[in-house]
């Protein structure tokens, strides 16, 4: 049966069906004849014909059943044949679609290869153009540094202090910046430069590469910055040996790049290695050692390990005090950083001590109008708030706003009031049923013109403090001024180079000869790296 073809099965079923139909007709005829015979037979002769008739009828029923079953089997077999044919059709379609899919994949792969080749050609042409500009700027930069190496050691404009936790990630005003989840933006170029080379003079050739790496890293172009650093490290170790200050500097830079990529383990290893080299080559009390310790503290702070960061920050403070003196502004910055770390651990007595000492240094050395004075007062106010010392916090907030107002608009008088005083008068007038006066409106407009993140933060914090005291009208006044100030100065800030501050821009300008257009094309990194390394005198 298994060897029979489908046609043989169909033919056999039809033959059986025809044979059963013929037998049914024959038995039906015999049955009718017997019924007629039984009717004409006497009663005593009837049993035999009736018995035959009964057998014929039984056989007829079986034949009818057999015919029906044969018809059903034939129908089922035909359906099975149809399903098999449909299945074969679907299989053929599937094979055809698979072939088409394979062809489309080949076409797509070929098109992608052509697209990549085209993009590489475009990128190569753009890189050639950029390379020529860089070569010109590098030559100009090197010519300038050779004339006076000492005066151009620092990368970009550097203020009195330039490698502290505040500049490397610990925000001076927003306490949330101390949380590890907040450090997602690339480190600004001037901050990375300061943190990497403080207290150590970088050779001109290495400084140029250093500036290029910093520029790429500040733009988030890590795929270019990292290979440049690694190539420079390899060449420096070949020419100068591993235990050399230049190697430590490049390790610092690469660590900061890794840190911005959230590769904290790699960054920590590099910083520890740089620290060991600097301690061995420069001594344990060198400012560059303090800078590396500070970078390690930042790294721990980014991971929320404030307890581990604190001793590193304290050691950096000791070095600065020893080298610079107890009342140097850099010492004040380090005190500010240490206070921020202690604040995140709830050590408020130490926080107050560090902030107050930093405030004394700033006021005595830099004057009451220095921005660091307002920042430190703001930080100290935040510490007071966390301890429930609302009166002390309020007094400091008012001092900040009063000094900012006097600096911008002159001596305080009845016609020239600071915004907090206007806010409190509005609170009093609200209870008396009086509206805002023209002087108050003018005061709001003046306050909104003060473009200072510290002042804006102070307005928000004092407004929150007023709300806690139930002074809702005064709180709304300060919040309104803060919002106006933000809206006024947002268009100005949005025109900056991707959020990089003026110091970063000037540093980049000195590095690339005034060209501020970032390289946004997906480039051939190896070609660019080799050209840059060759231009700088390194073996690629």
From Swiss-Prot:
Q: Which InterPro entries match?
A: Kinesin_light, Kinesin_light_repeat, TPR-like_helical_dom_sf, TPR_rpt
- Per the record, the coiled-coil ranges are 34-138
Location(s), subcellular: Cytoplasm, Cytoskeleton; Cytoplasm; Nucleus envelope
Is-annotated flag, keyword Zinc?
A: no
Q: Name one GO cellular component term.
A: nuclear envelope
Q: What is its main location?
A: cytoplasm
Query: Phenotype on deletion?
Result: RNAi-mediated knockdown results in defects in nuclear migration in hyp7 hypodermal precursor cells. RNAi-mediated knockdown in a dhc-1 (js319) mutant background results in defective nuclei migrations in larval hypodermal P-cells.
- What job does the chain carry out? Kinesin is a microtubule-associated force-producing protein that may play a role in organelle transport. The light chain may function in coupling of cargo to the heavy chain or in the modulation of its ATPase activity. Recruits unc-83 (within the unc-83-unc-84 LINC complex) to the nuclear envelope during nuclear migration to mediate the link between the nuclear envelope and the microtubule cytoskeleton in hypodermal precursor cells.
* Comment block on domains: The light chain is composed of three structural domains: a large globular N-terminal domain which may be involved in binding to kinesin heavy chains, a central alpha-helical coiled-coil domain that mediates the light chain dimerization; and a small globular C-terminal which may play a role in regulating mechanochemical activity or attachment of kinesin to membrane-bound organelles.
Q: Quaternary form? A: Oligomeric complex composed of two heavy chains and two light chains. Interacts with unc-83; the interaction is direct. Interacts with unc-33; the interaction regulates unc-33 neurite localization. Interacts with casy-1.
State what protein this is by name.
Kinesin light chain
Gene giving rise to this polypeptide: klc-2
């Amino acid at each position: 049966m298994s060897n029979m073809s489908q046609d043989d099965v169909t033919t056999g079923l039809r033959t059986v069906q025809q044979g059963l139909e013929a037998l049914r007709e024959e038995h039906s005829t015999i049955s009718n004849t017997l019924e007629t015979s039984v009717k004409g037979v006497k009663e005593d002769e009837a049993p035999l014909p009736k018995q035959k008739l009964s057998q014929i009828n039984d056989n007829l029923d079986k034949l009818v059943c057999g015919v029906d079953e044969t018809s059903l089997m034939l129908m089922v077999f035909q359906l099975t044949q149809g399903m098999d044919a449909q299945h074969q059709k679907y299989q053929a379609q599937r094979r055809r679609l698979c072939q088409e899919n394979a062809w489309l994949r080949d076409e797509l792969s070929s098109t992608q290869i052509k697209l990549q080749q085209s993009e590489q050609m475009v990128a190569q042409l753009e890189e050639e153009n950029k390379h020529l500009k860089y070569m010109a700027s590098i030559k100009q930069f090197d010519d300038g540094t050779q004339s006076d190496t000492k005066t151009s050691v620092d990368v970009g404009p550097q203020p009195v202090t330039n490698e502290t936790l505040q500049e490397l990630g610990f925000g001076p005003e927003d306490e949330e910046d101390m949380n590890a989840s907040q450090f997602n933006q690339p480190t600004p170029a001037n901050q990375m430069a300061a943190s990497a080379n403080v207290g150590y003079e970088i050779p001109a050739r290495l400084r140029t590469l250093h500036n290029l790496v910093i520029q790429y890293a500040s733009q988030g172009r890590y795929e270019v910055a990292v290979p440049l650093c690694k190539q420079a490290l390899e060449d420096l170790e070949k020419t100068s040996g591993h235990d050399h200050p230049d190697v430590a500097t490049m390790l610092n830079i690469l660590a900061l790049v890794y840190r911005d990529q959230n590769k904290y383990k790699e960054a920590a290893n590099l910083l520890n290695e740089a620290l060991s080299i600097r301690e061995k080559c420069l001594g344990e009390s060198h400012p560059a050692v303090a800078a590396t310790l500070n970078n390690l503290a930042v790294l721990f702070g980014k991971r929320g390990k404030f307890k581990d960061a604190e001793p590193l920050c304290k050691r950096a403070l000791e070095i600065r005090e020893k080298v610079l003196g107890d009342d140097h502004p850099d010492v004040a910055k380090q005190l500010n950083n240490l206070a921020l770390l202690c604040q995140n651990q709830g050590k408020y007595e130490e926080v107050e001590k560090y902030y107050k000492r930093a405030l004394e240094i700033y006021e005595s050395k830099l004057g009451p109008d220095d921005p660091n004075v307002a920042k430190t007062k703001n930080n100290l106010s935040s510490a007071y708030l966390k301890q429930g010392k609302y009166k002390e916090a309020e007094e400091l907030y008012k001092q900040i706003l009063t000094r900012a107002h006097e600096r911008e608009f002159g001596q305080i008088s009845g016609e020239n009031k600071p915004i907090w005083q206007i806010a409190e008068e509005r609170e009093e007038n609200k209870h008396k049923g009086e509206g805002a006066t023209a002087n108050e409106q003018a005061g709001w407009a003046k306050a909104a013109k003060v473009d200072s993140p510290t002042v804006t933060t102070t307005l928000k914090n004092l407004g929150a403090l007023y709300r806690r005291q139930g002074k809702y009208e005064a709180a709304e006044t300060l919040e309104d001024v803060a919002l106006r100030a933000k809206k006024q100065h947002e268009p100005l800030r949005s025109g900056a180079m991707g959020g990089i501050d003026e110091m970063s821009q000037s540093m980049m300008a000195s590095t690339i000869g005034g060209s501020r257009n970032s390289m946004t094309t997906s480039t051939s990194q190896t070609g660019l790296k080799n050209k840059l390394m060759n231009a700088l005198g390194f073996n690629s």
